[in-house]
Amino acid sequence: MNSALELNDVSKHYPGFSLEGVSFTLPQGCILGLVGENGAGKSTLIRLIMGASKREGGSIRVLGQEVDSEGFCDLKQEVGVVLDETHFPEGLTARQMERVLRGTYSNWQPGVYFDFLSRFELPPDKPFRDFSRGMRMKLGIAAALSHEARLLLLDEPTGGLDPMVRDEILEVFSEFTRDESRSVLISSHIVSDLEKLCDYIAFLHKGRLLFFEEKDALKESCGLVVCGRAQGEALPKGAVLGCETGPYGMRCLVRRALVPRDVEVEPVGLEELILLLVKGEKER
C-alpha cells in the first residue's frame, strides 16, 4: 500500500520545547487523528509536514516526496491545508477569493468551490470580515477541497463550532476519503470527533509520540478496570497504563493481554483512554 505520509525520527527544538523522535507512516486512503494537550506539538508537527518550518532531524515524505526536495513546492498543489485561524483578506468576498485562488492552484475547480459555498450556505458576496468563525472555517474547507488535493492537513478545523456544524464538516472529510487515493491528517481537542472519523490515532505528549495505532486495534488492546483501591494496586504494573482514583475506588486503563483472566475488563472509549494515559504519563 502506498503511503500518504512517512515520518522518521523527526525533531524540532524551540526554547522551552522540543519535538523528539516522531515516526509513523500513514497509509494512503486513511484518516489520521492527531491528539494531545495544548503545547504537545501538534501544530508544530503540521508546520513541519507542510514545509513551513524546518526540522532539525529525521525525514518527512509527503505523497512519496521529501519535504525539502526541489519538487516539493509543486507537490503542494496536491495538499489542502486548513488552519485553526483561516486567513483570507477581510475585505474580500467569497466570490472575489475564488478569483485569487484560481490564479494560485493549477488544478483549481471553480464549480466544486461554488458547490461547497451552496452546500455550506455561505453567501458569495458577503465580506470575509462579516463571517462568523464557523463560516470562516467552512470557507477554508471549501478552498482546500477545490483544487484536487490528495492530502488534507487540518489543524483544529472544528474547534469552537457547535455540534451540528461539526458533524456537517466531519461528513465532508469522510466523503473526501471515499476516493482511496486521498488521505487526511486532522488535529483536534475534540476526541469524540476523531473517534467517529479516524482510522488511525497518534497521541503527542510534551513533544513525544506516545503511540500511533489503528483506532480499532487500540481500543481492542486496551480496556478499563473499575475496582477498589486494593484490587487496583494489585494489578500487574506492566498492565496498567494510567489510573484515576476517586472516593469510591479506581478506574485503571490496562493492556488486556497482561491482566489476569479473573479480572473483569470493560471496553474503554477513546476519550477516557487518552485522559487516563495522560494521567499515567504525569505520574511517571
Where are these regions (language model features)?
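Conserved beta-strand
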Residues: 7-10, 17-27, 58
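The feature captures the beta-strand-to-loop junction immediately N-terminal to the Walker
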Residues: 32-37
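Helix-to-loop junction immediately C-terminal to a conserved catalytic motif
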Residues: 50
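Conserved ABC transporter NBD signature motif
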Residues: 58-68, 74-75
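ABC-family P-loop ATPase nucleotide-binding domains
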Residues: 77, 81-139
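A short, proline-enriched helix->beta-strand linker immediately N-terminal to the Walker B motif
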Residues: 146-150
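Catalytic Walker B motif of ABC-type/P-loop ATPase nucleotide-binding domains
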Residues: 152-156, 161
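ABC transporter nucleotide-binding domain
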Residues: 170-254
